[in-house]
Amino acid sequence: MLMLVFRLGDNRYAIATPAIVTVLPRVNLQSLPGSSPAVAGVFRYQGQVVPVLDLNQLLRGAASSALLSTRIVLVNQGAPDEPTRLLGLLAEQATETLESHQVEEIAERVDFCQSPYLSEMLVSQQDIIQQLQIYSLLSQQAYDELIAQAATVS
């Protein structure tokens, strides 16, 4: 399986590509006043309002840097048996892919944090990569609330 690898600070993370719709350059986002700091804002993609989460803010507590390599990774966050739920993930240095045969999965999952959206840790030749579980990032209710809030500020 192919994975998109990105970096937040000194740590590397990966998203499995089957969930990725496309990778976009950073665009201007409309902010949603009163939303969580992890919500970077919303934008329109092919006529649909898409909420964007700042992964650096979510995982490290600081806003993503405006780097040339900062991208919006557009994913379908809906489970296979659910309707499509487009979600943008603001990720720094999202410029590398990795095949699953290039890494080893750590047999024992180390739970240093209680984040439901972090899953297996993978070991590459360079370092350890933490996999992101996109289906756990935002509940259906939270997603619907962001879309409703975006409609009031549009």
Model-derived features: positions:
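An acidic, low-aromatic, low-complexity terminal/linker signal
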Residues: 1-154
